[in-house]
Amino acid sequence: MKLCVLTIATLLVTATSLETQKEIAEGNELTREETPSLVEHKEDEAAAASEKRSCIEEWKTCENSCECCGSSTICSSTWAEGKEIKLCKNEGGTFKKVLHFIQKGISKLKSCKEGN
């Protein structure tokens, strides 16, 4: 009798563990299916970072144009290396305008002192 109960208990444990393994395997399949979308998401992030770098590089060459980052956006003017350039406003243009205003003020003070 004890042997019979032990055999039945072993069969139940085995059947349960097989079901658990099947659920785990199905979960792994779902994970594998999600992986391509995760890869696409990472590729999107890399493309966005590349576009942002491109825009920053473009600030230097974006003279007299409000087309930064490949699309027409609101720009602000600023000065860099002695010449006026346009910056994408959403990429920190306001900060650079304030910085330019301070630099321009200091430059005027220096030229006044040198002139007198």
From Swiss-Prot:
One of its GO terms (cellular component) is extracellular region. The presence of a 'disulfide through disulfide knot' structurally defines this protein as a knottin. Residues 18-53 form a propeptide. Residues 25-45 are annotated as: Disordered. It comes from Chilobrachys guangxiensis (Chinese earth tiger tarantula). Probable ion channel inhibitor. This is U30-theraphotoxin-Cg1b. It comes from the Eukaryota.
